[in-house]
Amino acid sequence: MKKIVLVITILLMSVSVSAQKKKKNAKVSMDVDGVCMMCKSRIEKAALNCKGVKYAQWNVKTHELKLIVDERKTTVKTIQQSIANVGHDTKDVKAPKEAYDSLHGCCKYRDLEIQEDHKKEKQ
């Protein structure tokens, strides 16, 4: 009976350890605020500068940033902070005022006028 309990305990422990294993090529997506191709370049560069980010592509229309990440080397929170530090908001991390204020005039995505101007350009 003790052997059965021991075997079950070992199996449960191995299952819980494997469930916590971080992936080498995890696919991650998040929304990032921005309005133009300059924003795209800045957002992708900020993400790629994080250790462990292998691929970054931001869609101007949908604001979706798709990433391939080595979860053993970085976290989503670290990537979001890097993007915020260059002036772009994510759902969980807002850009500091000084970072947002340093953006080029056409990249001020919080300004409704700028958003409307970019919508007209896309049509």
Residue ranges and their predicted role:
Residues 33-47, 105-109:
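Short, thiol/selenol-centered motifs that function as redox-active sites or metal-ligating centers
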Residues 40-82:
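N-terminal, post-signal-peptide region of Sec/Tat-exported proteins
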Residues 65-66, 96, 100-102:
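Short secondary-structure boundary/hinge segments and terminal tails
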Residues 87-99:
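Conserved short beta-strand edge segments in small beta-sheet-based binding/regulatory domains
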Residues 1-24:
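Bacterial Sec-dependent N-terminal signal peptides
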Residues 13, 30-33, 100-101:
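Processing junctions and N-termini across compartments
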Residues 22-34:
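Short glycine-/aliphatic-rich beta-strand segments at the starts of folded cytosolic domains
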Residues 100-122:
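Short, low-order "capping/linker" segments at domain edges
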